[in-house]
């Protein structure tokens, strides 16, 4: 008898879908190896869950899924790779994904202050600003 094992990535996806159905989340960002993308898409489509796809490097794929109104906002905000988002776009995305709000605020301030190259000591009035 042969046992079929479910890859960890797909177990994570199934947990996200469960949380979405229970109302724990309104939107999810699921990153997986592209080799699992077809299975992930089949699972989402079979349950009628709307989704968006975004390449994430050579091997990975970002799959956003959840409430349609959230995905419409994501479609407008996330128009380039995640590492190229502005501090404001990054903050909005994190808040929409339900990340800890205080941690998002700290991340935003750190990214915003770090833009001038002084390490955040200038309080936004750095003479080194580009």
Give short role names for the model-derived ranges.
Residues 1-130:
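Domain-length accessory/inserted modules outside core catalytic folds
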């Amino acid at each position: 008898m042969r046992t079929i094992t479910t890859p960890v990535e797909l177990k994570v996806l199934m947990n996200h879908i469960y949380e979405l159905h229970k109302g724990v989340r309104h939107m999810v960002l699921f990153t997986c190896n592209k080799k699992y993308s077809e299975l992930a898409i089949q699972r989402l489509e079979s349950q009628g869950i709307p989704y968006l796809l975004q390449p994430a490097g050579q091997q990975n794929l970002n799959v956003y899924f959840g409430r349609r109104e959230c995905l419409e906002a994501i479609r407008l905000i996330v128009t380039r790779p995640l590492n190229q988002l502005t501090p404001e776009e990054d903050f909005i995305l994190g808040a929409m994904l339900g990340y800890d709000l205080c941690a998002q605020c700290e991340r935003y301030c750190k990214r915003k202050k770090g833009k001038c190259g002084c390490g955040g000591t200038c309080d936004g009035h750095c003479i080194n600003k580009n």
